[in-house]
């Protein structure tokens, strides 16, 4: 199982759909994708994690790095996740306070706070 | 002797293999199904940390994972050979860059958040993370 990435634009948001496993081996690909989007001027990102089977601290580090990058441009990075085992990792690291986590892409795209 | 022992070159692509093997052996040993995700994540974090320590220190020897099935418990020991400056030193960033320290600490934070019984040791010959989970007796596991 590898990492799959696809992006699409919804209004002023860019949705990054992630599938597979985000770990020390695959996380650099996600980092590259986020860096590329920000460099191309996409500052409002929605990362859809519904297809993610595994996430570790390396993946969390990449997401935090992405958040730092978009914030430098007054942008946003929202997550879509309903999977308890993935949410648990955000909770034990305290990152639920850092990332807005939504239950659907529609909700994340509509969010403005 | 370990029930299953795994040695792998300190490369990120092998961490997934270690996770899969550890989860398979843990399941066989009777670790609760609900906890297997945690085992997978914790062993992945420990191996990721060991790979980083070996790479930062330029160590070419493999990372060692021991999966030990005991009565009523299952243990995983992940050992690295990265020397620490002082015995008992838990911060491995001393010889490497500061950049990796954050990720290393996040990995340890995840492990201690997930596993109740965890022991981290380090010395001049390397370090070890030992994690232990209770197992269900086989009779109960079959029912």
Curated annotation (Swiss-Prot), chain A:
Keywords: Phosphoprotein. Residues 3-112 form the STAS domain. GO terms for molecular function: anti-sigma factor antagonist activity; identical protein binding. The modification Phosphoserine is found at residue 57. InterPro entries: Anti-sigma_ant (IPR003658), STAS_dom (IPR002645), STAS_dom_sf (IPR036513). CDD domains: STAS_anti-anti-sigma_factors. It holds the Pfam family STAS. Gene3D superfamilies: STAS domain. It comes from the Bacteria. Phosphorylated by RsbW on a serine residue. Positive regulator of sigma-B activity. Non-phosphorylated RsbV binds to RsbW, preventing its association with sigma-B. When phosphorylated, releases RsbW, which is then free to complex with and inactivate sigma-B. Belongs to the anti-sigma-factor antagonist family. This is Anti-sigma-B factor antagonist. The lineage of its organism: Bacteria, Bacillati, Actinomycetota, Actinomycetes, Kitasatosporales.
């Amino acid at each position: 199982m590898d990492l799959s990435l696809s992006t699409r634009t919804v209004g002023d948001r860019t949705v990054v759909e992630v599938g597979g496993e985000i770990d020390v081996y695959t996380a650099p690909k996600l980092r590259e994708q986020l860096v590329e989007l920000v460099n191309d001027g996409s500052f409002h990102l929605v990362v859809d994690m519904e297809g993610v089977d595994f996430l570790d601290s390396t993946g969390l580090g990449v997401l935090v790095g992405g958040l730092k990058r978009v914030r430098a441009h007054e942008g946003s990075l929202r997550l879509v996740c309903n999977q308890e085992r993935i949410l648990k990792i955000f909770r034990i690291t305290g990152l639920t306070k850092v990332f807005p986590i939504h239950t659907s892409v529609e909700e994340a795209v509509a969010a403005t706070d | 002797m370990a029930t299953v022992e795994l040695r792998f070159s300190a490369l990120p692509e092998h961490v997934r293999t270690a996770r899969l093997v550890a989860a398979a052996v843990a399941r066989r040993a009777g670790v609760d199904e609900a906890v297997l995700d945690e085992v997978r994540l914790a062993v992945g974090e420990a191996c990721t940390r060991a790979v980083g320590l070996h790479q930062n220190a330029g160590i070419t020897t493999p990372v060692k994972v021991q999966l030990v099935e005991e009565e009523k418990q299952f243990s995983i020991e992940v050992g690295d050979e990265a020397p620490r400056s002082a015995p008992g030193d838990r911060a491995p960033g001393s010889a490497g860059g500061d950049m990796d320290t954050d990720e290393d600490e996040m990995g340890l934070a995840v492990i201690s958040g997930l596993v109740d019984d965890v022991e981290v040791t380090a010395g001049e010959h390397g370090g070890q993370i030992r994690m232990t989970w209770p197992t269900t007796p086989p009779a109960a596991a079959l029912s």
